[in-house]
């Protein structure tokens, strides 16, 4: 009797348990990647703010020195310009390093979304036309994990493109108002929608990373 019971076990359970474990790992990875993104975003804003302050400071010095045309002031102007260029280059390199870090995070987000899509395709192959599929955890169908992952991915993909533009323009603009607008864009991340945190927390709750 016992042997017969063992013989009735289908291969579905181990396939789904592997899928559930992978999706749970992905949810934790999403959480960790977003935390790392926020840390880099804050660091990038500090650097961008330093770039803005440096440029505004130079503009103010230029206005003051326009009132003086002595040889001494000319020599001092060249010295200040050289120091400014060196400092600006250093800050721009720091901002580029931050962008490189954000790019690596976004690539990892793409892999998470791709993996979740693959799990959905595996489940479709496994169940075929069957409409009733048991949820891997509590209530979410597997496809919902992909929908949430894809939505988060698109937010951060667009945000990364915006930050690249901001970093490029910030180093070249001489307009203080435009500079402040770029800083605001970097800080407030307009493409990361307000419900992104809700999506993440819901996924963590569904997969058991948060207590019900």
UniProtKB/Swiss-Prot annotation:
Question: What happens to this protein after translation, modification-wise?
Answer: Phosphorylated by CDC7 but not by CDK2.
The encoding gene is: CINP
- Keyword presence, Cell membrane: no
Look up the domain of life of the source: Eukaryota
Q: Where in this protein does the record say Phosphoserine is found? A: 69, 73
| PANTHER family reported for this sequence | CYCLIN-DEPENDENT KINASE 2-INTERACTING PROTEIN
Q: Where are the transmembrane segments?
A: none
Species per Swiss-Prot/TrEMBL record: Homo sapiens
Q: Which family does it belong to?
A: Belongs to the CINP family.
The modified positions for N-acetylmethionine read: 1
Q: What does this protein do?
A: Component of the DNA replication complex, which interacts with two kinases, CDK2 and CDC7, thereby providing a functional and physical link between CDK2 and CDC7 during firing of the origins of replication. Regulates ATR-mediated checkpoint signaling in response to DNA damage. Part of the 55LCC heterohexameric ATPase complex which is chromatin-associated and promotes replisome proteostasis to maintain replication fork progression and genome stability. Required for replication fork progression, sister chromatid cohesion, and chromosome stability.
InterPro entries the UniProt entry points to: Cyclin-dep_Kinase_2_interact
Give a GO biological-process term. cell division
Q: How does it assemble?
A: Homodimer. Part of the 55LCC heterohexameric ATPase complex composed at least of AIRIM, AFG2A, AFG2B and CINP. Interacts with AIRIM. Interacts with CDK2 and CDC7. Interacts with the components of the replication complex, MCM2, MCM3, MCM4, MCM5, MCM6, MCM7 and with ORC2-containing complexes. Interacts with ATRIP. Interacts with CEP152. Associates with pre-60S ribosomal particles.
Q: Which UniProt keywords apply?
A: Acetylation, Cell cycle, Cell division, Coiled coil, DNA damage, DNA repair, DNA replication, Nucleus, Phosphoprotein, Ribosome biogenesis
Query: Which residue spans adopt a coiled-coil conformation according to this UniProt entry?
Result: 73-107
| Protein localization | Nucleus
Q: What is its main location?
A: nucleus
Give the GO molecular function terms: preribosome binding
An example Gene Ontology CC term for this record: nucleus
Would the keyword Iron turn up in this protein's UniProt record? no
Positions binding Na(+) in this chain are: 202
Q: What is this protein called?
A: Cyclin-dependent kinase 2-interacting protein
């Amino acid at each position: 009797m016992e042997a017969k019971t063992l013989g009735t076990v289908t291969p579905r359970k181990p396939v789904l348990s592997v899928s559930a474990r992978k999706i749970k790992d992905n949810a934790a990875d999403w959480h960790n990647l977003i935390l790392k993104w926020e840390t880099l975003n804050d660091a990038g804003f500090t650097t961008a703010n330093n770039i803005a302050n440096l440029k505004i400071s130079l503009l103010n010095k230029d206005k003051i020195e326009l009132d003086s045309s002595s040889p001494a002031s000319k020599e001092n102007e060249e010295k200040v310009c050289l120091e400014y260029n060196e400092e600006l280059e250093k800050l721009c390199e720091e901002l580029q390093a931050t962008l490189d870090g954000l790019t690596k995070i976004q690539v990892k987000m793409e892999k998470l979304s791709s993996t979740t899509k693959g799990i959905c395709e595996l489940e479709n192959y496994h169940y075929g036309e069957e409409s009733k599929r048991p949820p891997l955890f509590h209530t979410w169908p597997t496809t919902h994990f992909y929908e949430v992952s894809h939505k988060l991915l698109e937010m951060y993909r667009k945000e990364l493109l915006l930050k690249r533009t901001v970093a490029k323009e910030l180093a070249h603009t001489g307009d203080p108002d435009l500079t402040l607008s770029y800083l605001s864009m970097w800080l407030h991340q307009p493409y990361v929608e307000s419900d992104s945190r809700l999506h993440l927390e819901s996924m963590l709750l569904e997969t058991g990373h948060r207590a019900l």
